[in-house]
Amino acid sequence: SQATALARDMLARMRSNPGALQNYALSHYSPTALVEPDGEPCSAHASDLSCTAQELAAYDVAQWFNALRGWAEVAVQAGNAEPVAGLVEPSVCIYAAGNSVTVAVAWRGLSAQAAPPASACGVGLGRYGMDDREHRAVELRSWVPGPGVLP
């Protein structure tokens, strides 16, 4: 699913920047509240890395939130670009404890369901219908080696 692909993408970003794992940690965060980073983008693949691990983490989160909101595909109407892909009402929870990380992505489903998903990410925010019955979530756990440690 799209949510699974996005969660895997964030885990890959965290693995490529293990020195800043705590900078990726977010709890019940809504991508719509994100402010775009200032200045030139950081890139882990640049020949001359011009940003710190923390700056790269902030930029990774900003890029990832744009993907969650659907900015990879846009429709332009009356000169205004609007995302046409992405998850409906996404919430994000990223936990880092030592080298163990969990990435949870929640979104609003099309209809109510009897049994809620096991993930509590996004629950209780009033975004997923009455009693969170339209709450959907995917949660991935992984281990990220520390800086200089090969997996």
Task: Give names to the regions the model predicted.
Residues Q2-P151:
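Flexible, low-complexity segments enriched in proline/glycine/serine and punctuated by aromatic residues
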